């Protein structure tokens, strides 16, 4: 299966934002206290308020994994309902249990499977994307073209990625902004951790574009 990049346009009528690792409902102090909150409820409320302050209902919010932890399906649906944005695209992270129930109940049974091994109808590749309500599941990896610019998105940062030799960007999360090579001020790649711990809000395409202009195009492989 050959999958074309997803094309999006950022303009005054429709803006594109990116974030990762919100960890809604995470009940461990090392998450919410590090972000300046007393408990998970205060943490949830603050993150929802900030998202709604930045992202409009008509915009697109692309979330690169680890949306939430330790949450029941009703709690998950409540948080999702409180986020005003009506178009949230989701990349799988490594903490998927909270969103897995929603996915299995509403999505998995409707996905097409490309079978290439084994005898089970579930042996194969899930064909993305699939949308249910305001959530679109994009799988573990996706290539985007936003305003004509190539962006590779996934949860985990990678040193080498498609089209990097032509100036493509990579957006990721996972490290909670502890990896210096994926931070704003690191000059020697066009890779950025868009996670909440680094920015405290979703980043817009123009904000990311400004950051990437200050990063060097470094060729890491032989595709020069």
How should each PLM-predicted stretch be described?
Residues 17-19, 24-138:
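Core catalytic region of metal-dependent phosphoesterases/phosphodiesterases
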Residues 108-222:
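Conserved beta-sheet core of the metallophosphoesterase superfamily
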Residues 13, 58, 85-87, 148, ...:
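A general structural motif
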Residues 1-38, 193-224:
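Acidic, histidine-bearing metal-coordination/catalytic regions of metal-dependent phosphoesterases
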Residues 11, 49-50, 56, 145, ...:
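Residue-level detector of transmembrane insertion/anchoring sites
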Residues 3-4, 47-50, 74-79, 138-140, ...:
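A generic local structural motif
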């Amino acid at each position: 299966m050959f999958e074309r990049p997803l094309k999006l346009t950022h303009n005054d009528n429709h803006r594109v934002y990116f974030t990762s690792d919100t960890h809604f409902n995470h009940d461990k102090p090392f998450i919410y206290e590090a972000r300046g909150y007393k408990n998970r409820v205060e943490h949830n409320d603050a993150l929802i308020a900030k998202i709604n302050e930045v992202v409009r209902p008509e915009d697109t919010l692309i979330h690169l994994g680890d949306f939430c932890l330790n949450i029941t399906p009703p709690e998950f649906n409540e948080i999702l309902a409180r986020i005003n944005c009506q178009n949230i695209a989701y990349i799988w992270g490594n903490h998927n249990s909270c969103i897995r129930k929603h996915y299995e109940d509403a999505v998995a049974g409707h996905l097409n499977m490309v079978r290439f091994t084994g005898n089970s109808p579930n042996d194969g590749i899930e064909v993305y994307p699939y949308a249910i309500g305001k959530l679109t599941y994009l799988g573990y990896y996706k290539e985007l073209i936003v305003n004509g610019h190539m962006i590779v998105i996934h949860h985990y940062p990678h040193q080498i990625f498609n089209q990097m030799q032509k100036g493509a960007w990579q957006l990721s999360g996972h490290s909670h902004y502890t990896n210096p090579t994926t931070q704003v001020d690191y000059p020697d790649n066009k890779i950025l951790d868009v996670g909440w711990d680094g920015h405290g809000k979703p980043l817009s395409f123009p904000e990311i574009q400004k950051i990437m202009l200050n990063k060097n195009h470094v060729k890491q492989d032989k595709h020069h």
